[in-house]
Amino acid sequence: MFLDGSTGAGKSRSLLIPTIDLLTYGADDGESRPQTIIVSDVKSELIELTGDELERRGYRVLLLDAQHPEKSDTFNPLEMVDRLANGGNLPGAEQAADAVARTLIAGEGDAKASHWTESARSLLAATILLVVLDEGCPRGCKHLATVYHIMCLGTEGAGEDPCEPLKGLFRSLPQGHPARSRASQFISSGGNELRSIVSTLKVNLRIYASAPIARMVSGDDIDPSRILSEKTALFLHVMDEGSPYNAIAAVLFEQLYAAVYSIADAAGGKLPRPVSILGDEWGNLPKVECLPSLLSLGRSYDLFWMGAVQNISQLNKYGERDGRKKILANCGVKVAMKLGEAEDRQYFTELVGKTTRHTMGTSSSRGPSGGTGSTSYSEHADDLIHPWEWTEMSPDKDGVIVVKTAENGVGREHAGCFRAPVCDCTRMPTKEHFDLGTREHEAAKRMEYQARLISRQMGREDGVDLWTPEFEEEAAEPPVADGWSGLFVD
């Protein structure tokens, strides 16, 4: 489901909170089986208003909050890599490390920047595999804070090449080691190329030098396999678009989708419990690589997505050919609430379609001998909703426009274009279910929930253990200049 609504359209209170209520209501032995929900939450409003009731309904309520890590449960992106490696699935561990690196280091547009980006991703994947596969690294140290720690120590050498300690560490690995092959570009780089690779990586990883963030990414409270198997409500605090902290949530989505296949296969082709992703302000997240595939194949596994954006252009990061078009095409339900951009208005005008307008024209004339008259009839196709009409529509007064694609086995009366009324969640049964009410009442409810989240840090230390590999004491000798050295271009 795709939901398009600019700021102030009422997405959260009119649709998202009631949807959370609907998806989690009922008993496991009843006809309406509660689903696992994964919710991106911009203001932490959704968990603060619904968390207490979800716990009473038997849900394990989790929060991933990089802005306030002291409130957050823990999620270790390296845990899946380590689990696959320990299970003897080294190719799977390599793919998982590559996926973490690809998500944490944002892509660039131009070709030159893409080279630095891809090289930095390879170096990050190499360092992740170095940490995970080294038997001398304690399990409690296998996290991103250790990866950044090694990256900094290994690129601050005192010799002519500050990166020689890290290069030497990778050179000391056996030829068949997966970390060495991924570090090859880094090992052979120098000059401006080397500086660009290292700086790109450090800029994207520096947040893991923070002690609270390091603690947040060092534990396994949030386990993708467990979330997909148990009755869980996971809330992800999403920050402004472009924030590096959002990449942690994007990694979690990638690992959740990667775990779907093995869990569904073990359960006969379906997940043990249906899972719905409610993506409020989905455009704030960095590119989630698996989203197009999730929309194409997820429903067959009982995995569903409802994404809310402020405008369609927020999907441009997925690319026009195989990304954005594929996402929109695979959303069987599209909802227009309040369209602020011309592109969005034009898109939904074309999507809603046209109607036939019948017109009648009359004419008359007078002359010396009297008057004559004629009547003509015509018909023409016209937009059902003109682009300019969207600006005059208000969801609370005019409802929302829903376009639903026909499905096999579902009657035609359930497909087409509809105008659906919406209202605030305090005018629905959801009000009693989640104890909602006046602004003052809800503000007090939210503050009480925040206080309980903050109490988690009482008596808890943010420090984490770091592992330091044995770097070579002496840097390797620099290459001897020869007749070819002048051909090297930085």
Report the location of each language-model feature:
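P-loop NTPase motor domains
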Residues: F2-L303, E389-G416, P421-D490
